[in-house]
From Swiss-Prot:
This is Secreted phosphoprotein 24. Multiply phosphorylated at serine residues. One of its GO terms (cellular component) is extracellular region. PANTHER family: SECRETED PHOSPHOPROTEIN 24. It comes from Sus scrofa (Pig).
Length: 204
């Protein structure tokens, strides 16, 4: 029995060695890679938000890694962001800025997908759930990414973008007419209070 177990262990070691030598990429996910991906995600938010202050990340964690090729992969990350005391046009590194204090300081929990190729960040997509700055307990979601379209101001801090082409399609007009004639089920006297995801592209 012991000899059989040793034989199986030896076969397992040889098998893993074979796959490593057969060209399958082996990645070492050190903390610096995670910091770089989080930094790129925060930079995407800061580049497309309308807040006069920079946001800084806190409590980041790696959720998933997808190998795309021999030298490329994507990382799914979850992290929090909070507004800092540094002005957006100050040129400061958000990681060196102090967080603003106060109960109503803008903050959010975000999930991002960062594509890395040849050890360089190639693409970043971020989705954040923002806590409301009002006295209500409502929240809203925003999507930050590089999608072509025109911008429309959505609130004091963030921009939600809707491609112009979708507004010119007959299907879009028919959908609006259907919504006017047949409101969604539930209490028809009050608007829908569920937060909606918004797409942010950064193009004016």
């Amino acid at each position: 029995m012991e000899k059989r177990a040793m034989r199986m262990l030896a076969m397992f070691v040889l098998g893993t060695s074979f796959w490593s030598c057969a060209g399958f990429p082996v990645y070492d996910y050190d903390p610096s890679s995670l910091r770089e991906a989080v930094g790129a995600s925060v930079a995407k938010v800061n580049s497309q938000s309308l807040s006069p202050y920079l946001f800084r990340a806190f409590r980041s964690s790696l959720k998933r890694v997808n190998v795309l090729g021999e030298d490329s992969l994507s990382m799914d990350i979850e992290f929090g962001i909070r507004e800092t005391t540094c002005k957006r046009d100050s040129g400061e590194d958000p990681a060196t800025c102090d967080f603003q204090r106060g109960y109503f300081t803008p903050s959010a929990i975000c999930r991002s997908t960062v594509q890395i190729s040849a050890e360089k960040v190639q693409d970043v997509w971020v989705r954040c759930r923002w806590s409301s700055s009002s006295e209500s307990n409502s929240s809203e979601e925003m999507i930050f990414g590089d999608i072509l379209g025109s911008s429309t101001s959505r609130n004091n801090y963030l921009r939600g973008l809707i491609p112009d082409v979708s507004r010119t399609e007959p299907l879009y007009e028919r959908s609006l007419e259907t919504m006017r004639r047949f409101p969604p089920p539930g209490n028809r006297s009050f608007p829908n209070q569920w937060p909606r995801a918004r797409t942010n592209t950064g193009f004016e």
